[in-house]
Amino acid sequence: MQKDIFSKTAPVHYAWVILAVGTLVVFCALGLARFGYTMVLPAMQAGLGLSNTQAGGLATANLIGYLALSVIGGALAARYGPRIVITAGLTVAAAGMLLTGLSDSFADAAAWRAITGMGSGASNVPAIGLLAAWFVQRRRGLAAGIGVTGSSFALIVLGLLVPHVLDGYGWNGWRMCWFIFAGITLGTAVFSFTILRNCPSDLGLLPLGAPKGSSTATVVARELNWSSVYRSGVVWHLGLIYVAFGFSYIIYMTFFTKYLITEGGYTQGAAGRLFMIMGWFSLLCGLVWGSVSDRLGRKTALVAVYIIQAFAFSLFALWPSSPGCVLSAVLFGFSAWSIPAIMAATCGDLLGPRLAPAGLGFITLFFGIGQAAGPGVAGIIADASQTLSPALLLASGVALLGAVGSLFLRSDLRQQSVHAD
């Protein structure tokens, strides 16, 4: 039936539909579920009477949940198909956000932020990994780069929406924000289940860019060489590099709005506008850097992005006036989601379309460890020093370590022998 509806003669390849829905999944799973906290944090922190350490602890709880499910979610997607895993993950994330809005204490909020993170991990990793099945190798960087812009659209929407909701609902504005995020995410879960397909062969199609006459056969789960994921030295190297991104960027993103308000002299509305500007600049980052990695290599792109982000974080810490904050936001926006896009494309290169979600889930374990540690460490440093600047400088230093680690990657990460498509 589906093969008749979505025929090979359709004017638009269904891979583009998959990419559009995948971008929407990222919008909810990361954009609303994780970065929504950045915009809501000042009001939520005041409403619940949280210290900086506790505020960082809520972010850490969310990221521990993400870490717990990202590896399992990727493996489940490889075995049972991304469609059902993505749908279930978004549903769990929506429930977690709804309950976050009902929280009355740090303990309640931490529990529900962890549940939200679990749903995010179970949906985001398979959504990006799914692109490896729908796009041939030479287009995977581009596709992943577009997919991660879901977070960019979220920054734009959050920058516009949250200040108005906070103004309109007063003391309970932060709760209403979480309710809105939950409703959007639940709707996306239903939409994703309706539209997503696990692989081109489900519709009698080939991956976008594949030559005519290529086989549409898929490998069954029991025939997959699972050990190729966990025994690959290159995959472990990628994971270790990914730690640096997780640790550094989440410090910047978690405390971005709070730093602007408490140390940069911004109002909530002005901070929201700068958050939106960051989102606009980040719209093309995955597309640009994904294409750069397709043309110049994954290694070159990773080194360049880490250096740009290290400079953005240090600028934010050392120049907390309007010009410095704006330049920092622009630089980070230009490179924001490029590292996840490059990592997703690299996993597709190394492991093939069926194992790509499992590989991405595995290296996301390392990424998640960095993310889980970052906000808590930053909050402790901020409470001890009474400023967020030292924590931001730490983020900058860790990003530089990521650049150094990337220099030791092989120049050509393509066509390795670890997979058999």
What are these regions (language model features)?
Residues 30, 115-127, 332-343:
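Core transmembrane helices of Major Facilitator Superfamily
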Residues 37-41, 232-284:
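Extracytoplasmic gate region of multi-pass secondary transporters
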Residues 49, 81, 102-108, 136, ...:
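Helix-breaking motifs and short loop linkers at transmembrane-helix boundaries and internal kinks
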Residues 68-106, 293, 299:
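Conserved MFS/SLC helix-loop-helix module at the cytosolic interface between two early adjacent transmembrane helices
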Residues 112-150:
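Cytoplasmic helix-loop-helix junction between adjacent transmembrane helices
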Residues 146-201:
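Helix-loop-helix hairpin linking two adjacent transmembrane segments in secondary transporters
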Residues 278-286, 291-346:
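C-terminal transmembrane helical hairpin of 12-TM major facilitator-type secondary transporters
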